[in-house]
Amino acid sequence: MSSQKRPSEESTGSGTKKVKLEETKTPSLKSEASNLALPKMNDSSNNINAVPLALPKGGDKKKKANSKTAQSGKNGGKEDGTGQKQKATDPNKMQDVLISAGVDLKEEEALLSSTVNVSKTQQNAVVIPPHPPFLHPDQVSNFMKKVAKTQNFNLSFTKNTEILDMMSSACESYLRDIITNTIVVSRHRRKGVKVNYGRRSQVAAALRSIAINQKKEEERRMKKRIALGLEKEDYENKMDSEETLHRASNVTATLRAGSKKQYGWLTSSINKPASIGVKSAGKVATEIAARGESGLKFREAREEPGIVMRDLLFALEHRRIGVHNIISKGYARIRD
């Protein structure tokens, strides 16, 4: 083997290059062509050739462009937001604009709060309270306990509230029916019955209208003469006619009841004055008195207004259960 010296380069800190001779041992059998090999590249050139070059893709370009626009928009938005905040935070200008437009902020805030409160109250008021009972549950339970003791069975009605509600509603419907019938009877009692007597002659209708007009004129003249002091009102004839009606009704009632007692509502309530005026002897008064009952006379039915005991008894007579004692006591009270 033969040794051969080859120059080598080393870099120093001062930037100068020193050439060294390195001894290389080469085999003797090697051909001369091996000595003519190309010089080797250093490590940096090998690394550059080893790494392949990557071309930029189209999606990467778009992403980079979008990121740049987003960053620029953020920066611009920050600047615009600060400018708007500075403009919006100027209270004097805003108040001046609102006042010039005729807007009151306090009233608007109050209106907004009131609408919110109203909506909340409406939502809370959706729940409808239950219907209050007609009778108090405690009173109903006590009464039912008394009835249960007489029937020799015990039951706690306070726990079963449905039974108490059912009894209260039943009593309410029962009393409502009785009161409705009583009101209907009272109205029919006070209302006159219209009877169709057939076709009337025109002559009779004309004569009746003439008589009614004459009586109205005579009564008008009589009132004028009494007001002027020319005649005095006759009380005796008026009271005598009403007394006769009361007596006749009392007699009819006694015959119906079979006793000598009289109804209190049939007794006369007219008090005669202590001093009765002297009978007038005027011409008009004598003509009216002479006519008497032969003339036209209008009289209202002597019926009590509203609901009376007999209306209630008539409504109870159509009931079958639990009304016999009440009806007998009611008629006894009317007789007394």
Swiss-Prot record:
Residue segments, region Disordered: 1-93
Basic and acidic residues biased stretches: 76-90
Sequence ranges assigned to domain Histone-fold in this UniProt record: 141-209
Nucleus found in the keyword field: yes
Compartments where found: Nucleus
GO biological process, one term: transcription initiation at RNA polymerase II promoter
Function, as annotated: Functions as a component of the DNA-binding general transcription factor complex TFIID. Binding of TFIID to a promoter (with or without TATA element) is the initial step in pre-initiation complex (PIC) formation. TFIID plays a key role in the regulation of gene expression by RNA polymerase II through different activities such as transcription activator interaction, core promoter recognition and selectivity, TFIIA and TFIIB interaction, chromatin modification (histone acetylation by TAF1), facilitation of DNA opening and initiation of transcription.
Assembly and binders: The 1.2 MDa TFIID complex is composed of TATA binding protein (TBP) and the 14 TBP-associated factors.
Protein name, as recorded: Transcription initiation factor TFIID subunit 4
Organism: Candida glabrata (strain ATCC 2001 / BCRC 20586 / JCM 3761 / NBRC 0622 / NRRL Y-65 / CBS 138) (Yeast)
Lineage, opening ranks: Eukaryota, Fungi, Dikarya, Ascomycota, Saccharomycotina
